[in-house]
Regions:
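Outer-membrane beta-barrel channel domains
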Residues: 1-215
Length: 215
């Protein structure tokens, strides 16, 4: 069960995943920039910006969207499969989960595919595809590319994501994008960092966690 917490921020609660099925090798499904921590309720780590009230990190894939209601109560899962592994420079993760109907939520299928490839000496590039289909209630599809490059004391990262949700309650069919780029240079006497992020007002990721829109 989730610990009760008081939310004093304007961002929604972000509770950690505790189910073993989703925890095993869950790092393969991490997308975007390396986690910097978050000041969100449910996390004890500081936010990337260092400000206590900064938004938590976006999670393109957040497994708590599967088999759990918004209140945290369980929704039955009829069946599911999950495969993770490595082959040479590639890390691959795939899952397919069928969630049972539980009024007012229709029976829903969740699919996730993540491929990441090591490049150069200490860098990686990757892609992720997500698909959620609810019987009679349309679909939500998400596709993204990401890269993290490291050259000694300099590290750079970027990602871009597009969503499509024809029956979304958001205007424009939930079709929008998010993108982020950052750099970090750290030496013994110098620390320089910067970041730029755009999150579209209609960006709609039903299998992830997005703390805010229209950034």
């Amino acid at each position: 069960a989730d610990e009760q917490q008081v939310n004093l921020t304007r961002f929604s609660l972000l509770f950690p995943e505790k189910r073993e099925f989703f925890l095993e090798n869950s790092g393969i499904f991490q997308f975007g920039l390396p986690s910097t921590g978050s000041s969100a309720v449910g996390s004890a780590r500081p936010a990337a910006s260092g400000r206590q009230n900064s938004p938590p990190d976006m999670k393109l894939f957040f497994s708590r969207q599967i088999g759990l209601s918004k209140s945290g109560s369980a929704i039955p899962i009829q069946f599911g499969s999950r495969v993770t592994g490595r082959a040479g420079p590639y890390a691959i993760g795939a899952l397919n989960i069928q969630q049972a109907e539980q009024d007012p939520v229709a029976a829903t299928n969740f699919t996730a595919l993540r491929v990441d490839r090591s490049v150069l000496a200490n860098s990686d590039i990757g892609m992720m595809l997500l698909n959620k289909e609810a019987g009679g209630q349309g679909y939500n599809r998400v596709g993204g590319l990401d890269a993290n490059l490291r050259f000694g004391q300099l590290s750079m990262g970027a990602y871009g994501v597009k969503t499509a949700a024809p029956q979304s309650i958001l205007p424009g069919s939930g079709e929008d994008f998010t993108a982020r780029a950052n750099f970090n240079y750290a030496s013994r006497n110098v620390l320089v960092r910067g970041a730029y992020e755009v999150i579209g007002q209609r960006f709609h990721d039903e299998m992830g966690y997005v703390p805010r829109l229209g950034v």
